[in-house]
Amino acid sequence: MSQRGDRGEGHARRPGRSSSFGGGHRGGGGVGGAGKGGGGSSGQPPLATNRSFRKSGNGHGGHQRAVSQPDTHGFQPAPAPTALQTPPLRPPAPQNAPAHVPVPAPRPQHHDPSGARAPTLPPSSENTANAPPLKGIPHAAPRAPSRISSTSTSQGAPKGGAYNLQFGSFPMNGGTGGSTMQFPARTSSAPPNLDEQKRMQALPEGHKVVPSGLVPQAPKHQQQQQPLQQQKQQPQSQPPLQQTRKDVVSSNHSSKPINPHIPSQVKSSVHVSPSVPNVAPPRPPVQQIPGMPMSMPFHHQAPLQFGGHNPQIPPQGVVPSSLQMSMGLHGANAPQVAQQMYIPTIQHHHQLQPPTMMHQAAGIPYGPAAHQLTQMSGMMNVGVAPQFTPQQPNKYVTGPTRKTTVKITHPDTHEELKLDKRMDSSGQRGLPSVQQQSQPVSTYGSPMGFYQQNSYNQSTMFYPTTSGVGQVPTVSQGPRFVSTQTVSYISPSMNTGPGSNKDNLAGSTTSGHSQVTGKPHPAGLHMEKSGVQTVTISAPPGKSDVNKLKPAEDVVSHRQKDNEAVSGVRKSGENESKASPITEKHPTPVSQPLQALAANPETTAAASFVVNSVPGDDGKSKESIQRTGSFKDSNKNATKDTRNLSQEPQSASSAEDLKVHTSVKDVCCGVSLMESKGVNKESEQTNAASASPTEMLKAADASSIDRSSARSTSESTENVQEVGKSDVAIGDSEKSGITNKVSPDLTKDDISSGSTGNESHEVCTLDLAEQLPVGASNPDNLDTATSVTDQGQLLKEPSSSVSDENVIMDRSHQSAEKMSDLVDDTVASVASSETLPESIIQNANAKGNTSGNQETGSATSSNILNVLPVPHSVASEDPLKPESMLKDQSSSAPAASARPVSREKPSVEITRTKFTAVKKKKRREMLSKADAAGSSDLYNAYKGPEEKVDFIGASESLDSSSIADHELPDESSEKEVNMGEDEGKKKVELDDWEDAAEMSTPKLERSDSSNQTTEANGRKRYSRDFLLTLAQSCTNLPVGFQMIEYASVLFPNLAGKSYVVDHPSPGRGADRPASRGDRRGVVIEDDRWGKSGHLFGSGRDMSMDNGPPTMNHRGAPGVMRNPRGGLINVGPVAPQMSRSGSDADRWQQKGIFPSPVTPMQVMHKAEKKYVVGKVSDEEEAKQRQLKAILNKLTPQNFEKLFEKVKEVNIDNVATLTGVISQIFDKALMEPTFCEMYANFCFHLAGALPDFSEDNEKITFKRLLLNKCQEEFERGEREEAEADKTEEEGEIKQTKEEREEKRIRARRRMLGNIRLIGELYKKRMLTERIMHECIKKLLGNYQNPDEENIEALCKLMSTIGEMIDHAKAKEHMDAYFDIMLKLSTSQQLSSRVRFMLRDSIDLRKNKWQQRRKVEGPKKIDEVHRDAAQERHAQSSRLARGSVVGSGPRRGAAPMDYGPRGSAAALASPSSQQVGHRGMPSHSRGFGTQDIRFEERSPLDHRTTVLPPRKDEAITLGPQGGLARGMSIRGQPLISNAELSSADSRRMVSGPNGYNSASTAREEPGSRIPDRSGRIAPNTQFAGPSNRPASQEGRSGNKLYSEDDLREKSISAIREYYSAKDEKEVALCIEELNAPSFYPSVVSLWVNDSFERKDMERELLTKLFVSLCNSRNNLLSKSHLTAGLATVLGSLEDALSDAPRAAEYLGRLLARFVVESILSLQEVGTLIEKGGEEPGELVHHGIGADVLGAVLESIKVEKGDSFLNEAKASSNLKLEDFRPQHLKRSKLDAFMKA
């Protein structure tokens, strides 16, 4: 298939070609050459799903498409090309051709810019389709061929005019002869790109049906090039496949040839159905299904994230149009070969949006089999998790593994620098040739090229199953906006100079992967150095030594969290940046690896690149961003934790070997080198050459522009110039509009630097791209600016270069916009940072001579951009993110992410927003103050781009004064920087131009006329240290400062963008955060940043890292994570929810900046502040305190609160009257608690003293009596008022009002009557008063009042027993005669008549309540009653279920749980009744009873009735009629004894006792209303032959001793609460264990020793009742045996209850009085008591007990009874009193 080689045009790639993801994504751009220099062509042809189809290479690797090689490459081995062999050149393009005009040119796929040859393909690989994935390091290719001509000679490369073949960002021919056009990406709203038109024309040619031979036709112009390219690409493991940008090439699992179907391309915005070429898939270990067409939405450029804990494989840019699916292999520590999954015969149209790209969540360890793929319809993606444990490293199931070493050849010596050697901290080989395992792409619906409501919706998510391996299968990532997405590059180690793409070799070299210099993605896509392929990087001849780089421990593999992809996409205007991100002829090709630096501090910044400015097509020198390739060896002892970067193997050659001219020093202005916390401080500080402080001071002293250029004190500019002979084409920033800024964002933890803290964090505050002056003078001047950081110097003076971490944070967080300020500051910061190389300063001077702008551009650009040494992090501009977002990127993405600028617009077109000097000054002041408060780092990060002021990252060691003195010499340079930075904002490729509207900040722009020299404006830069000294004095924000003004700019972007700071790329694959909350789909809207209108916000960087669930569940060590972020669960349970938001939340909560959506609410303050509880009047304060106590009064806390009342100083009559009034008010409104309030009055009367007033004694009782009378009369008066008709002049009352008033009066009267009765019971009132009250209530009984009669009945029920005695018998008879007459009167309502009847019956029954009067209950009583009610209900329900089911043996077991029988028919597991009657297994769904959560903690008894042997249990009514009617049967429950917990819980009746045995045989034994006590949990199945009458008592059941003990204790406790003797009797009967009764007695008596007197009294009554009962449940023998046991242990009991002897004596006395025991029997028990008989008497305890007995008898019955008892007992008291006791209680009775 012939296809055009135009820039914007993708080329049909051979489907069989698997990219060198190690089987995964193509290393370079989306297409073979898209990644330019990618080890192989991208495995997937670019799918033009982006809004703008200019983005020829949607592949993450690069933006440009390389011309695919002829088919012969894939199948026939060709001789390896020579090292300098260059691909065929395309026809010359006009130099002044518009950026967006496509110039047809093949993209060299595997060539270093310098012409270095690509790694050779192993000859054994016969078939490219089956060849193992290439492990080369992919280099993202610029969207358009680099226009920067490389001066380096490329042998055998035809120089075709102005054609410059570029490998990645490196010109393939290595010469400067011609410059290829680089075209900026444009969004769909931008004017149409001519290349699209050409593509339209070329399409018919390009889309020819591929012959069955699987040999796609190459474009005509490429067919000529095939010989050359074959030679070059054959060495490489994977030849690039041609693809058209809009082509979708389906892969076929089977190797059968398939004729691709190529629909015609309608227009650039429409996806063209790709031809479906036959692809030879890798041999899968699993049976493959020949082909499975699957409709799967393609997720554009979503690198599949590597889910393993170990080094991450660089993310592969998934070419949107490719149908091949990269399946990342899980690998522990060894390089893995990612397989490509081919889904043949899949076609999709752009219009349909759901391309067939299937992102597999976790790498499939075996060849993708069709059976593994889940067919999903519509928008749903297929998330396929590996069914088997991912293959361990080095175990590649697919096809023969192809190890391609990255060869970096020196152009002159052709010496190869091998990157194969694994040098990461783990000592294992990284995956240099293996593309980063595709990050799991969230299976969101369709790509987000346009905003579809459902395109990013979670509803379509398909979650892969988790794998058994420790590495959790990465969750598929969601698609990013293809239009502006830059594939986030994971390699943090890259320092993408602003000018240079993130793919700059400098960054890549540091990273284990040789990073392909990625050119800015046209669409602003984050170029992901996806698939870092093997790239032959020829070291520029300029380098004195080209040594093998040591692989930096940290590999560039770390993707930036938000796709702050390392796509060093720069503004289209940047000719140089476009031309070649880092087409550097200089030896700067690779940053020195950290290890090398650590090892050899002296090494010059070998890695630093000197960018030669190559004249662009427009004739302007292009600036290759000079980046300090050298990275601090973050960890000499690089621990895995510190390896923030995915630990991809660094190039085998050590960085030390790769040396740049030592004389040249790269200065990273504003780069703060953070001294590593301890490990290798010196080594870490490789990025910034640390100059001596004196040097810095000198630079600071220089006030002239030359000074601002940071004239180096010691280094000669000559060195720099030598190194930078290739001119750094800074290019007019106007045209270059380089928006690529070294993202100062690099977070402290740039990658995981925070983890060990060893890594020195360096942030290059300067944004070179922005710095480039518009009017930059000739590039020649600029080339001097290029300088290499002298790493040796840095290493030597680490401390000096060390900057405050906060400053670094400031840098890191500050957005690229801030970088503009930094650019102004760059010279200052450079000067301030001791690391400035002299040469750089001189260069700056030279440049400064040209113009102020130049100075800034050259010095800062060349110097500053080199600095970004954040260990492995390259600040990359995030094309999607506004610079405000970039702040986040730097922190989040360890890999420096250069923000790709929309390259489509020339820089001239870019509006350069400039801040007014005043605005900047205000911002600086504000930020300095915030910084002083310690909040500047993150606060600045969240400010709008225009508001961020970058603090100069001066080394802390530097004098702040020196920094302060240093001024940027030229305002114009500052202006340029601002312009560049603002351009970056505008150029940031938003997803849509509509979104760009939000980004527009015209108000922030400053007119060019305002540009003044820095000195003229008086603007100075101060170090953070110096500003901190002013923190104490500067505490107020500027006048008129409003936070919302800044938030307004920030929030629109925040709403839809990913934040680097918030979501830093974790240092390791395992640490990589799972899907972020801000990327949630429609269903889950972010609660903080959700912005109406755009679900995903403008320019939002759709998550390329919606990746695997965090395995370690920790983010990059130094990065602040969302405090609320939860760990996500793998699988559909917790989809995409791992981190709900950004760290902005934390700052929002701290009030550092306002809420993003709503302005801060102004708090309204009252003039007079209300203070709670302050009362001026002392008396009022007392009354309030008393009222508070009464409000809390309950039976439980009565005693405690009464003590508080006594603490209140009640010292006068007024206070006492107030207390009584409050008590009455409470009692009258709460009649139920009248008893408690009466008790309160009783205690209060005894505690309060008497008062005298006017010589009159005032007592509490008297005041209380007066109050009672007053309230009584008041009630009558109120009732009369309610009944009387309105008089004239009074307000008329409605009927309802009068009724309400009457009810209120009646309630108060009833409460008063009840309180009076309770007070009388407490002897607080006299009997005469009670009679008076009764008479008043009876009143005129001929015409009775119902309210009074009701009150009378209440009073009688309260005090009747006390007042009805012989003396008052006449009065009482008279009262009840009247009441009897009233009970038959028809004048009263039936309710009142029944009340009268009840009172009369009560008197007849000797005032024994038929049912207990409900008084206030304690909370435990309430719970108990509720539990009993539930038991009763469950019993009834259980009965009904059993009767209904019939006596079926084997019937489903009934669940008689306390909550009812909701689960009665649940699963058979309910047979296993567990504790509390709940089935031991969970109930069936929906069977849980509503009371499940209502169970009180006290309801811990199970209602299981202990099984009987063979006896049936009668259920149902227990009256005589009920006998014989209930179903009987044998319980299914085994007869094994239940546990004590179960057996002791048998209560289910109202009082908590189960009475299953109440169906007695004796006539009249029917106990009313006992049905609730039927054992609810017993289960009946088989019928019994026994007649019902033979059931007998239930006491035949056997219980263990423990069960009996617990049941007896439970029974007595229930008795203390319920006071129901009959219930205890029933419990004793059920126990049916007479032999255990003595133990019951001893247990109860011993328990009573620690109880209250009232409970002991109750126990005494119970014993008497049980002994005197008809059934004689407790015989005398049982009682005496139990008491003997008590006496035996009494000595021990005295230690716990010192008065136990006294308590026992009272009990025994009661037995004597009740004639249960005689005094003689009691004496015998005492005499024999003790552990040994007579021991109690010997110790004197017996005398105490007997003395208590005699004393109690005397008190209760008097002396006469006592004497009679003594006489009848014949006791000799002397026998009980030991002689050694001095005195005893018996002494008093012995004398008598």
From Swiss-Prot:
Gene3D superfamilies: 1.25.40.180
Chain intervals with Low complexity compositional bias: 216-243, 263-278, 432-442, 699-718, 1439-1450, 1461-1470
Keywords attached to this entry: Initiation factor, Protein biosynthesis, Translation regulation
Ranges of compositional bias, category Acidic residues: 1278-1289
The protein's role, per its UniProt record: Component of the protein complex eIF4F, which is involved in the recognition of the mRNA cap, ATP-dependent unwinding of 5'-terminal secondary structure and recruitment of mRNA to the ribosome.
Stated family: Belongs to the eukaryotic initiation factor 4G family.
Name of the protein this chain belongs to: Eukaryotic translation initiation factor 4G
High-level lineage: Eukaryota, Viridiplantae, Streptophyta, Embryophyta, Tracheophyta
